[in-house]
């Protein structure tokens, strides 16, 4: 459960990210593919080389979904329902991959915003990414 302080930290951090969210999403995907090569199996049709246009484009989709989630922190299931359906029923992404991507998103944000990435912000973002992952995997059950 996200506390009021968590919500403030999440919104504040996302505001600071601003127009870089898509770039960070692509970088986090690159990190995921490099650190956890099994995640590449869901993208056989992509050029998975670091910085490829396809990885950047998908990273922007990830960032856009997270931006939607930030705007709907009080109703993540409603805001992410269609995306949950897509990942559960069509793409059939193994739920562990959301945790791996979440970790890489945290690393990416910490690298780009080290001064703002306090322990409290880290904890809030971790809780947020976990909440998003939980929603995205809720229809698997």
From Swiss-Prot:
Q: Does the keyword Transport apply?
A: yes
One BP term from GO: hydrogen peroxide catabolic process
Q: Which residues carry this modification: N6-acetyllysine?
A: 16
Q: Which InterPro entries match?
A: Globin, Globin-like_sf, Globin/Proto, Hemoglobin_a-typ, Hemoglobin_oxygen_transport, Hemoglobin_pi
The tissues where this chain's protein is expressed are given as: Red blood cells.
Question: In this protein, which residues make up the domain named Globin?
Answer: 1-141
Identify residues that carry N6-succinyllysine.
Answer: 7, 11, 16, 40
Kindly list the positions at which Phosphotyrosine occurs in this protein: 24
Modification Phosphothreonine, positions: 8, 108, 134, 137
Q: Which UniProt keywords apply?
A: Acetylation, Heme, Iron, Metal-binding, Oxygen transport, Phosphoprotein, Transport
Residue positions, PTM Phosphoserine: 3, 35, 49, 102, 124, 138
* Sites where the protein binds O2: 58
| Binding positions (heme b) | 87
Q: Single GO cellular component annotation?
A: hemoglobin complex
Q: Show the PROSITE patterns listed in the entry.
A: GLOBIN
> What residues form the membrane-spanning segments?
none
Among Gene3D superfamilies, the record links this protein to:
Globins (1.10.490.10)
The molecular function terms of the Gene Ontology recorded here are: haptoglobin binding; heme binding; iron ion binding; organic acid binding; oxygen binding; oxygen carrier activity; peroxidase activity
As for family, the record states: Belongs to the globin family.
Quote the function comment for this protein: Involved in oxygen transport from the lung to the various peripheral tissues.
> Quaternary structure?
Heterotetramer of two alpha chains and two beta chains.
Its protein name is Hemoglobin subunit alpha
Q: Which gene encodes it?
A: HBA
């Amino acid at each position: 459960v996200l506390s009021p302080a968590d919500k403030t930290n999440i919104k504040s951090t996302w505001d600071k990210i601003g127009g870089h969210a898509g770039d960070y999403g692509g970088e986090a995907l690159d990190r995921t593919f490099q650190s956890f090569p099994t995640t590449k199996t869901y993208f056989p049709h992509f050029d998975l080389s670091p910085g490829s246009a396809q990885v950047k484009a998908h990273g922007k989709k990830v960032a856009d979904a997270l931006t939607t989630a930030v705007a709907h922190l009080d109703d993540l299931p409603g805001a992410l329902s269609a995306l949950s359906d897509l990942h559960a029923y069509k793409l059939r992404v193994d739920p562990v991959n959301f945790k791996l991507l979440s970790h890489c998103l945290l690393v990416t944000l910490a690298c780009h915003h080290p001064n703002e990435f306090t322990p409290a912000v880290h904890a809030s973002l971790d809780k947020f990414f976990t909440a998003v992952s939980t929603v995205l995997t809720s229809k698997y059950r």
